């Protein structure tokens, strides 16, 4: 057993990529700052011959063994070896599968690597995050047609945080500021694929949020127009006129949290997708 400031061997045995094991084990290991794991990752272990090598390495460097194996023969052999050399082993998905089986009253299909359909969702989120960061605040307008959602609105209507929240759900989201006197990107006038949502808040709410923002960055002096009531009211009116002109969906965000705004956008997107004819 390792002592503080030492290390221990951590064997991760998977019949697929091993990403599930790595994610779980690192989340737990992070709670033990004084002990460092030496990871031994064994992906695609699907035969007795492949397991031979794994068992030899485990015996050579004993430690904790975590596994995601669906082939019962491999599981039994691995567990027996760990018992023989007196080291702990645990199936990461086994207890969860047992819980599902007890509740659902049916057995699994035993499909190797099935959990890695989750990986597709993971990469979808990463792609969406990359897209959203590249298309924040009106940047790279030439790529707006590639978005799932385009958020527009005046300053401090939560466009960026809502974009990031949606991206974390795998929704490619761009956002474009609406500023009186500055033409909108011409691409915004003729979008076909994306849902364009115009975020609106009352002038009173915008002034409050903007004042707090200026105070937080020490820029209250010299930015009086930014929080001038008439100026802000004109901005809100301008945004509403544009929304009406181009038929953008209107979403009132005055009393909404980021999560609530994102949920409303996702509902608009789902409704739109249901209404579109299947091509």
From Swiss-Prot:
Keywords: Kinase, Nucleotide-binding, Serine/threonine-protein kinase, Transferase. This is Putative pyruvate, phosphate dikinase regulatory protein. Belongs to the pyruvate, phosphate/water dikinase regulatory protein family. PDRP subfamily. NCBIfam families: PRK05339.1. It catalyses: N(tele)-phospho-L-histidyl/L-threonyl-[pyruvate, phosphate dikinase] + ADP = N(tele)-phospho-L-histidyl/O-phospho-L-threonyl-[pyruvate, phosphate dikinase] + AMP + H(+); N(tele)-phospho-L-histidyl/O-phospho-L-threonyl-[pyruvate, phosphate dikinase] + phosphate + H(+) = N(tele)-phospho-L-histidyl/L-threonyl-[pyruvate, phosphate dikinase] + diphosphate. Bifunctional serine/threonine kinase and phosphorylase involved in the regulation of the pyruvate, phosphate dikinase (PPDK) by catalyzing its phosphorylation/dephosphorylation. ADP binds at residues 153-160. Its EC number is 2.7.11.32, 2.7.4.27. Pfam families: Kinase-PPPase. It comes from Rhodopseudomonas palustris (strain BisA53). It comes from the Bacteria. The keyword Glycosyltransferase does not apply. InterPro entries: Kinase-pyrophosphorylase, PPDK_reg. GO terms for molecular function: ADP binding; ATP binding; phosphotransferase activity, phosphate group as acceptor; protein serine/threonine kinase activity.
